[in-house]
Amino acid sequence: MASSSDSEDDSFMAVDQEETVLEGTMDQDEEPHPVLEAEETRHNRSMSELPEEVLEYILSFLSPYQEHKTAALVCKQWYRLIKGVAHQCYHGFMKAVQEGNIQWESRTYPYPGTPITQRFSHSACYYDANQSMYVFGGCTQSSCNAAFNDLWRLDLNSKEWIRPLASGSYPSPKAGATLVVYKDLLVLFGGWTRPSPYPLHQPERFFDEIHTYSPSKNWWNCIVTTHGPPPMAGHSSCVIDDKMIVFGGSLGSRQMSNDVWVLDLEQWAWSKPNISGPSPHPRGGQSQIVIDDATILILGGCGGPNALFKDAWLLHMHSGPWAWQPLKVENEEHGAPELWCHPACRVGQCVVVFSQAPSGRAPLSPSLNSRPSPISATPPALVPETREYRSQSPVRSMDEAPCVNGRWGTLRPRAQRQTPSGSREGSLSPARGDGSPILNGGSLSPGTAAVGGSSLDSPVQAISPSTPSAPEGYDLKIGLSLAPRRGSLPDQKDLRLGSIDLNWDLKPASSSNPMDGMDNRTVGGSMRHPPEQTNGVHTPPHVASALAGAVSPGALRRSLEAIKAMSSKGPSASAALSPPLGSSPGSPGSQSLSSGETVPIPRPGPAQGDGHSLPPIARRLGHHPPQSLNVGKPLYQSMNCKPMQMYVLDIKDTKEKGRVKWKVFNSSSVVGPPETSLHTVVQGRGELIIFGGLMDKKQNVKYYPKTNALYFVRAKR
C-alpha cells in the first residue's frame, strides 16, 4: 500500500509539473504577437465581413421560395439583402423573357414524391401562401373514357409531388375546368367528362358546379348558386378584386359561347353584365389575361372545326356598360400557332405562350443540357423486365406513319407471284433456309433498288398485326439481336438515331408459315432458342399473312441511310448491324454464318442514289449526341420531332395604342423540349412551370415523359 501511495504522490507531482509547464506556456502565449494576431484575424472572418456585393451574389443562388424566407431570418443585413435579391430575381426574369434569354430545366423520373398520373386538359394555379402549384383533374391519353378528380400539390421548394387527402364534398371527375385563387381559397368551376362506354352513344357531360378548396383546412366545399351560366368547359376565368369573370367556353353539341359572366365571390351570386358594341366570335380554349383592375385581354381560341382564332380582344369593365375592343396584332407571322390548345401566361408587360416551333424541324433546346439534374445526376440502373411478351402485344396503328430519321413514310407491300422454286415473292419472310436479317424485330421483305451499283434482292419484312411488336424497354436495332439495354425505362420503346420503324398498308393476306426459318436463328448460329424464348421476345411459329404490293424505293433509301448512320459510329456499332441488302453468298459484301447462311454486310460511305446524306445535326453531333438531364439519353428521337418554343407577346401598348406585338427572337434558347398541347403554364417566383399536356403520337419521342413532363423556365445566368 505504501508503494502504491508513493506512486500516486509521484503521479500527482507529475501532473502538477505538467500544469505548471502549461501555465507557463499560456503566460508566454499571452504576450502580444502582432503577426500571430493578424493571422488569426484573417482566418476567423465571418460572412458578415464580406462585401455586400459578394454576399448578395451568393444569396442569389438560393431558391426563391423557402430558402429566401429562411435566410431573411438570420439578421437584419440578410433580411435587407434578401429583399433586394428577390426584387432582382423577379425583374431579371421579366427582362430575360422579353429578350428571349432563358434556360430550360427538365424534371424527369426519378424525382421525389409519388409520381403524378399522366394527364392533359387539367387545371393548375400557383398558391403563394405555401409556395406550391396545385393541379386538379384532367384526363389521360391511355383511357379515353376516364377523367380525374384528384388534387395534387407540387412543393416548389423541394420539387416534390404531394397528394393532399382532403375531406368534404369532392368535385366530380372532369377536365377543362378553371382553377383560380381567391384569398385563401382555390375556386374550381365548370369542366366536362366523357360518358361511360355503356350504354353506347351517350353525350359528354358538362358541369356548372362551383367548388372551393381550402389549403389550410384541407377541405373541399360545394357552392350552390342560382341563375348562373349553363354547364360549360374550355372557358377562361380570372379574379379581379372579389369578382371572378368567366368568358366563352364549349356548351356541348358543338356549341360555343361568347358570353361574359361575373361571380361575386363574397355573396356567391352570378350576374351577366351588359356589353355594348361588337363582341368576339364564340370560342373555347382561349387565354384570359388581366391587364389591370378594369381591363381583360382575350387571346386566341377555337370556334369549332376549321375555326381557329389568333385574334386579341380587350374587355373594358367601366362603371357604365362594358365594351369589347378588337386589337391590332403585329408580327402575326411570328406569333404562336394554335393558340387554342397552348395556354398563355403573363410575365410583366409580356404574355408568354409555349407552342410548336415554326419550322417543326428545329433541334431541341441545347439549354436543357446546360446544368446537371438537381435531383439525380446518375440515376440507379433499372433492371429490364423479364416477363414474356406474347404475340398479342400492341402494334402501331397502320394509319400512323412513323417518324424515321427525319422523314415520314411507309413501305407499301409488294404483289405476290409464284417463283419456279416454289417460294413467294412479297411474302412476309423468305422460305426456310434463306438468311434474312431482322429489321426492328421483323425480317426484311423482298425488294430491289440500286445502291452503289448493286441490286437489292433481299427479303424484307414488316411488323404485321400477327407479329409481336417490340416490347417496352427494348432497343430496336438492325440485326438479329433484340437484347434489353441497361438503364432504359420499362415504358420506353427506344429508337436511336439510325434505327427504323416500318409500317405497312396491309391488305388481305393468305395463310403461310414464313417465320419457321427464323425462329431458332442467331447471329453466330451457335445458339438455339425455342420460338417463345428467342431474345426474350415471343416469335409466333405461324404468321398467317402475306403482303401484296411493292416496296417503296424511298423507304428503302431511308433504311439504307439509317444503316450508314449507325455504321459511321464505329466498329462496335457496325458489328451489330445487318449487312447491306442484295449481297449473295460468297460475294465481297457478305458475311457467312456458321450454319452456311449468308447475310450482307453494310458498306459505310457517302449517300448514293438520290444524293441524300446524313442530317446536318447528326453530322454536327458526331459520336456525342446531346444527353438529357437524368436518364442520359439523346434529347431527340428523330430530326422531324416538333420542339416547343417560347413566343412572347408585347402588351405594353394595349390600352394606349390598341395593339399587341409578337416579338422576334434569333436565340436558340427559346426552343425547348418536345411540343405538348393542353398543358398548363403557371408563374412562380422568377420562373414559369409547365406541366403535363398531350404529346403528338407521331413525334415518336421516347426520352421524355409523355404527359406528365415537368419543365421550369428561368432566366439564363
Curated annotation (Swiss-Prot):
Polar residues bias spans: 416-426, 455-469
Name of the molecule in the record: F-box only protein 42
InterPro entries: F-box-like_dom_sf, F-box_dom, F-box_only_SRC, Kelch-typ_b-propeller
Modified residue annotations for Phosphoserine: 365, 373, 552
Any single GO CC term annotated in Swiss-Prot or TrEMBL for this entry: SCF ubiquitin ligase complex
Assembly and oligomerization: Component of some SCF complex, composed of CUL1, SKP1, RBX1 and FBXO42. Interacts (via the kelch domain) with p53/TP53; interaction is direct.
Gene encoding the protein: FBXO42
Keywords: Kelch repeat, Phosphoprotein, Repeat, Ubl conjugation pathway
Repeat (Kelch) residue spans along the chain: 132-184, 186-242, 244-293, 295-342
Domain F-box intervals: 44-93
Species: Homo sapiens
